[in-house]
Amino acid sequence: MRKHSGEKKRGTLATKIILVVCAAVIVSNVFSIMFVLRGAQSQIRSSVKTTMMDMAESSDMLVENAMSTLNQDQLTYDAYAFLLKDVKIKNVDSSYVYLVNEDGTMLYHPTEEKVGQPVENVVVTGLVKQLQNGEHPGNAVVDYDFHGTAKYAAYCIMSNNDIVVVSAD
């Protein structure tokens, strides 16, 4: 009878060891996945911001070159639309480009009714104030809240102080 009791204890101890090892493996995997996901999210966010800045700078150059070629200080809505309407981040449907003059008035927006209206974006209104105070802020990518929606914006200040903005949710 004692022989059975010893085998039962050994079996119980082996089962406990296996359970502890399995639990340790599961916990280790969960932590590893959490760290990998956190790092991946950071990399994706960084990549999107870099892409947005590249798009803003490219849009700036497109508009500057068109104005220089046509020898004009500003273009028509149709000319801006021709240059900017298809500028979007691939697979990000909420992304678009708009253009604001140094007074904060929309020169181009995919929603044409917004053209001629004051810009509503707090980041851009802040840039307008800085420009009006004689400051020349550097190009940047920022995140902000717009009517309860988290958004990203990359902006470039053009040579005539117009502001090119790439926006995305």
Predicted regions and their residues:
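Extracytoplasmic/periplasmic helical hairpin
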Residues: 63-117
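Juxtamembrane membrane-water interface segments immediately C-terminal to a transmembrane helix
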Residues: 37-61, 74
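Non-catalytic regulatory/interaction regions at protein termini and inter-domain linkers
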Residues: 1-11
